[in-house]
C-alpha cells in the first residue's frame, strides 16, 4: 500500500488555504502535519480522506492489485475531532456497530471488541454508556474503532487530544505497532507523537510548508 498526494490545493471560503502540497508515503511510513491553528492541517486531512474535494490535485491510495487507486473509505480510517460514538449506547455496543459497519471483509488484523478495549487500557468499563465517560476515556475508545476493523491507512486529527501523558505513550505504541505491520499514518498534531523517523510537514497557511523529520 502507498499513499500519494500530488499538487493538492484547497480553498476556505474565497481564500486558498494551501497550494502545491505533494507527498508520498509507503508502507510503514508516517507523516505528521504541524502548524498553528487555521494553517490548513485539518483541511488537508479531510481532503486526503475524501471528505472534501480539493481545488486541484490528486490523492491515490494504491497497491499492487489496484495501482490506479482505491476509494479512501475502503482502505483508510479517519479519526477527526469528534469521536463519532453514540452517547446513549454502551462502549461495547458502539464498537460492535463500527466493527460490523466498517468491515467489508474479515481480516486477521481485526481485533475483537474485548481485545480492542484492552488495547486502549479500558477493558473494565466497556459496559458503560459512552456519554458517561470522561473526555479522555471517550477519546481512547474512539481510537479503539481503528482496531476492530483493519484499514492500512490511519488519518488522525489531533489523536491525543484530552489525553494524559500515560495515554499519549499508549497511543504512540499503538501507532508504532500499526507502522511496524506495514501501515501508513497521516496525522495532525500540536505536540510530538513520539514516532520514530516520522516525516514532518509544517503548514503555515497559504502555500507555505516546510519538510523535515520529527519524532
UniProtKB/Swiss-Prot annotation:
It is a peripheral membrane protein. The keyword DNA repair does not apply. Keywords: ATP-binding, Cell inner membrane, Cell membrane, Cytochrome c-type biogenesis, Membrane, Nucleotide-binding, Translocase, Transport. It is an enzyme of class 7 (translocase). Residues 3-211 form the ABC transporter domain. Its EC number is 7.6.2.5. GO terms for molecular function: ABC-type heme transporter activity; ATP binding; ATP hydrolysis activity. ATP binds at residues 35-42. It is found in: Cell inner membrane. InterPro entries: AAA+_ATPase, ABC_transporter-like_ATP-bd, ABC_transporter-like_CS, ABC_transptr_haem_export_CcmA, P-loop_NTPase. GO terms for biological process: cytochrome complex assembly. PROSITE patterns: ABC_TRANSPORTER_1 (PS00211), ABC_TRANSPORTER_2 (PS50893), CCMA (PS51243). GO terms for cellular component: plasma membrane. It catalyses: heme b(in) + ATP + H2O = heme b(out) + ADP + phosphate + H(+). It comes from the Bacteria. The keyword Membrane applies. NCBIfam families: ccmA. PANTHER family: ABC TRANSPORTER I FAMILY MEMBER 1. The complex is composed of two ATP-binding proteins (CcmA) and two transmembrane proteins (CcmB). Part of the ABC transporter complex CcmAB involved in the biogenesis of c-type cytochromes; once thought to export heme, this seems not to be the case, but its exact role is uncertain. Responsible for energy coupling to the transport system. Belongs to the ABC transporter superfamily. CcmA exporter (TC 3.A.1.107) family. This is Cytochrome c biogenesis ATP-binding export protein CcmA.
Amino acid at each position: 500500500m502507498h499513499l500519494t498526494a500530488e499538487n493538492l490545493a484547497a480553498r476556505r471560503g474565497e481564500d486558498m488555504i494551501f497550494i502545491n502540497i505533494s507527498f508520498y508515503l509507503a508502507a510503514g511510513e508516517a507523516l505528521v502535519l504541524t502548524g498553528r491553528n487555521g494553517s490548513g492541517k485539518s483541511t488537508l486531512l479531510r481532503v486526503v480522506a475524501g471528505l472534501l474535494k480539493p481545488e486541484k490535485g490528486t490523492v491515490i491510495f494504491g497497491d499492487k492489485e489496484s495501482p490506479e487507486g482505491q476509494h479512501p473509505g475502503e482502505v483508510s480510517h479517519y479519526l477527526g475531532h469528534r469521536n463519532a460514538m453514540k452517547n446513549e449506547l454502551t462502549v461495547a455496543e458502539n464498537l460492535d456497530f463500527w466493527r460490523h459497519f466498517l468491515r467489508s471483509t474479515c481480516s486477521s488484523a481485526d481485533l475483537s471488541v474485548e481485545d480492542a478495549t484492552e488495547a486502549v487500557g479500558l477493558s473494565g468499563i466497556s459496559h458503560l454508556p459512552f456519554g458517561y465517560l470522561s473526555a479522555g476515556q471517550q477519546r481512547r475508545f474512539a481510537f479503539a474503532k481503528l482496531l476492530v476493523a483493519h484499514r492500512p491507512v490511519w488519518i488522525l486529527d489531533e489523536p491525543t487530544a484530552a489525553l494524559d501523558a500515560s495515554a499519549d505513550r499508549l497511543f504512540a505504541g499503538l501507532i508504532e505497532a500499526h507502522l511496524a505491520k506495514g501501515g501508513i499514518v497521516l496525522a495532525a498534531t500540536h505536540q510530538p507523537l513520539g514516532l520514530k523517523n516520522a516525516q514532518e510537514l509544517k503548514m503555515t497557511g497559504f502555500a507555505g510548508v516546510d519538510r523535515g523529520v520529527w519524532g
